[in-house]
Amino acid sequence: MKLLEQMVYVECFMIIMATLLVSMSYGHRAMINDVAEAPVIDNVGSPTNGLDSSWYDARATFYGDIHGGETQQGACGYGDLFKQGYGLETAALSTALFNEGYTCGACYQIMCVHDPQWCLPGTIKITATNFCPPDYSKTEGVWCNPPQKHFDLSLPMFLKIAQYKAGVVPVKYRRISCARTGGVKFETKGNPYFLMILPYNVGGAGDIKLMQVKGDKTGWITMQKNWGQNWTTGVNLTGQGISFRVTTSDGVTKDFNNVMPNNWGFGQTFDGKINF
């Protein structure tokens, strides 16, 4: 991709919750104290409507192996990222970007900049699926401490924009629309008195700011975000057909009607059939 020469300034599971933090591997280069200002960048990718799609400065490292080991599951609550459609195109976000899990599912376009020795041309597109935790015991090489904006990429994604030996590189990033295949999926967890739903494969903005549920015998019930992208209600909806109303961070709302039949069970996944 060609780079031009001007500048663009562009969030418990109460019964069984455990903090899911994947151990992170960081590069070994000396700390980069300042990320240089960015050149003007060609208008590539698919910006989201209603979201800020300006380019911003950050850094990137990698964790896991070439096959995506250590990147599965994580603090967003997703499981097998391959089965859920995210694959290797994922990243763990620093505190400044993770937003207590509300950013889970968001999509970003990232490019390596200002480091010709290590940067490779082109961009990558990733989904936020994990959290890169801060480490306050150190003062150097701690890229995920606030207020730093940082992407801990899967190794295959890092290698698309930088050489392995770089370890950590300055990047430019922006929000883009998530392109998904098929409908939004709804995975059931919990028990009759603590229904937990994990929505995934969410298109459009990708990240959810509000989720509601409705049974055959109820009105719309606002769910609570528990951890990551797991949403809960204490209302017993067993034996009822279930519908969902989902609002993404850009304000778009969609109704997913009659997603779950009245004989649904826990541990099942249902297809919402439509997407954003």
Curated annotation (Swiss-Prot):
Principal location class: secreted
Top-rank taxon, per record: Eukaryota
Membrane topology: Peripheral membrane protein
GO biological process: anatomical structure morphogenesis; plant-type cell wall loosening
InterPro entries assigned to the protein according to its UniProt record, in alphabetical order: Expan_Lol_pI (IPR007118), Expansin (IPR002963), Expansin/allergen_DPBB_dom (IPR007112), Expansin_CBD (IPR007117), Expansin_CBD_sf (IPR036749), RlpA-like_DPBB (IPR009009), RlpA-like_sf (IPR036908)
Keywords carried by this UniProt record: Cell wall, Cell wall biogenesis/degradation, Membrane, Secreted, Signal
Any one Pfam family match given in the protein's UniProt record, by short name: Expansin_C
All residue ranges annotated as the Expansin-like CBD domain in the record: 193-272
Domain (Expansin-like EG45) ranges: 73-183
A GO CC term attached to the entry: membrane
SMART domains reported in the protein's UniProt record: DPBB_1
Region forming the signal peptide: 1-27
Subcellular location: Secreted, Cell wall; Membrane
PANTHER family per UniProt: EXPANSIN-A15
Family: Belongs to the expansin family. Expansin A subfamily.
Function: Causes loosening and extension of plant cell walls by disrupting non-covalent bonding between cellulose microfibrils and matrix glucans. No enzymatic activity has been found.
Protein's recorded name: Expansin-A25
Organism listed in the record: Arabidopsis thaliana
